[in-house]
UniProtKB/Swiss-Prot annotation:
One of its GO terms (biological process) is RNA processing. It is found in: Cytoplasm. Its EC number is 2.7.7.8. Gene3D superfamilies: GHMP Kinase, N-terminal domain (3.30.230.70), K Homology domain, type 1 (3.30.1370.10), Nucleic acid-binding proteins (2.40.50.140). It holds the Pfam family S1. It catalyses: RNA(n+1) + phosphate = RNA(n) + a ribonucleoside 5'-diphosphate. GO terms for molecular function: 3'-5'-RNA exonuclease activity; magnesium ion binding; polyribonucleotide nucleotidyltransferase activity; RNA binding. Residues 554-613 form the KH domain. This is Polyribonucleotide nucleotidyltransferase. Residues 623-691 form the S1 motif domain. Keywords: Cytoplasm, Magnesium, Metal-binding, Nucleotidyltransferase, RNA-binding, Transferase. SMART domains: KH, S1. It comes from Bacillus mycoides (strain KBAB4) (Bacillus weihenstephanensis). InterPro entries: ExoRNase_PH_dom1 (IPR001247), ExoRNase_PH_dom2 (IPR015847), ExoRNase_PH_dom2_sf (IPR036345), KH_dom (IPR004087), KH_dom_type_1 (IPR004088), KH_dom_type_1_sf (IPR036612), NA-bd_OB-fold (IPR012340), PNPase (IPR012162).
Amino acid sequence: MSQEKQVFSIDLAGRQLTIETSQLAKQANGAVLVRYGDTAVLSTATASKEPKNVDFFPLTVNYEERLYAVGKIPGGFIKREGRPSEKAILASRLIDRPIRPLFADGFRNEVQVVSIVMSVDQDCSSEMAAMLGSSLALSISDIPFEGPIAGATVGRINGEFVINPTVEQQEQSDMHLVVAGTKDAINMVEAGADQVPEETMLEAIMFGHDEIKRLIAFQEEIVQAVGKEKTAVKLYEVDADLNQAVREMAETDMHSAIQVHEKHAREDAISVVKKRVIEHYEAEEADADTLGQVSEILYKIVKEEVRRLITVEKIRPDGRKGDEIRPLASEVGILSRTHGSGLFTRGQTQALSICTLGALGDVQILDGLGVEESKRFMHHYNFPSFSVGETRPMRGPGRREIGHGALGERALEPVLPSEKDFPYTVRLVSEVLESNGSTSQASICGSTLAMMDAGVPLKAPVAGIAMGLVKSGEHYTILTDIQGMEDHLGDMDFKVAGTAKGVTALQMDIKIDGLSREILEEALQQAKVGRMHILNHMLSVIAEPRIELSAYAPKIITMAINPDKIRDVIGPSGKQINKIIEETGVKIDIEQDGTVFISSINQEMNEKAKKIIEDIVREVQVGEIYLGKVKRVEKFGAFVELFSGKDGLVHISELALERVGKVEDVVKIGDEISVKVIEIDKQGRVNLSRKVLLKEEQEKEAAKEEAAKEENAQEQQ
């Protein structure tokens, strides 16, 4: 292989994509620098020389953001990047999922794929560059990877599909679809959409796959030019004699145990068989390696039998039909002091979702590589160990929890009211209380119930369902509402969320090489039937969002002021706005266009704050009449407060109709008097007159007297 830098280029969505090899990170097994527009991502792949003594494939994928990529210096005291952002974690998962199925069963060498984002052009996706770079780094390396794969982002504008849309195009698009796969089939889908029909989503997936084929052909050319010969590795295999002996000892009893319908009873029955076999080999003083192989064989017996029952006999572990959904139960308003709550139960999967409404100042501030600076809608997913009857340390959210939370967020965001119609920050927290598969979709259903209970005026309710697939040769079975065992031992986890009108989110992970269009189409249609069944159940519990918000939710008043007056409301160093907040206990958020949001639980305090702000921004107009209060008396006149923060001077000559010798003869401090604005000078000083109003009143009285005289004269005639 040549050690000189080599450059390969292709056009991708009207922008140049360039791959540079053999210059950077040469000690990694494989490394490429991907340039897409002005985006630059360094992707590397490294593998251990020897297999690890573990019973799984130790693959780690890292998508590393560097703030220098967008010309930022990290905040905080340390001034360096800390833990990965949510976006970086989701990007790592996005790359991991299509790559993982393409390593051989039994491969136990540790593999680490790292993509460092070094420069960002917002119109050229760094995630797509990293996915391509990760695939290519593995493909040109000596690591036995059965790729390459590629990914593409698909948008839809005015009914037309667009590959890798720009930021401006994304704002106009009614879907954001990421699809990845090999040249033969799709193996990963991640999508958010604005209630798009299933048929359209399928067309978008296939449209993206056409672009994937082109990118894979491009990668194959690069591999042909600079790729290393793949290392021959020994795959993990169990001893053939041991395999036969264990199967003879355990298969019959294990097959019976698998068909126990209830989850915990089934797990106990399987454990009894496993324990008996392992104790037999422990009694024979088998070493750790042999005992590990025995566990592996027992696992394979379970997997093979579950798959055979589903594909051949069409029997699921819990006795359901392929398209049957577990029993449903829902409840709302179960937590009195929260703003909204929804409990959703599907079989032995249960999620309790809580909705909290906050002011717009409660938005989440984003400090990453994207153009978004904040978001007003959040969905957080928690998966405590007690939900599966286990014990483990309680730590912060892992990649899985962050991924499931983001999926729910993506599914629900399209049906949220606009900020103009509902000026609240919305936070959802989904607590998984029981788990037997499909918890992410249960959290979506629970969150819909919680928002409806909270009075959030959703455009439409959303439900989610997880589909599964078990494929053996030409035989396959698509499963509706998969449980934990079917997810773990099956070939697909296909989550579909949406309304009665269409899809709002998709997520698909495949453990086999990929799926055909026909299977995808069948899965989508079967998911729609299941989703509608769940939606109907949810609507029987709460048919529409509550009209009134919770008494414990903040009340928000919206008002508009002249943008030039924003500085007056805020005051020097925030002095004025902080004074209002301290006096009323409200939260105040001001937009650049002059929109003001005032929020608190106490509506009376909201109104008080609004009145204060109205007085601050109110402008004095020549000719207007005010009832003001005398604040100060001088020899030359009286200063009158027209409203909060606005004073004017009534000169001594303008106090009365007659000549006034002393101001105190007419008014004193604290008196309320009516005055008229007669002038605002160049310095902004307001000159007032009481005399003008007295004269006008005198003239009105004179006019009344004259009219009365004329009326009397007419009567006498």
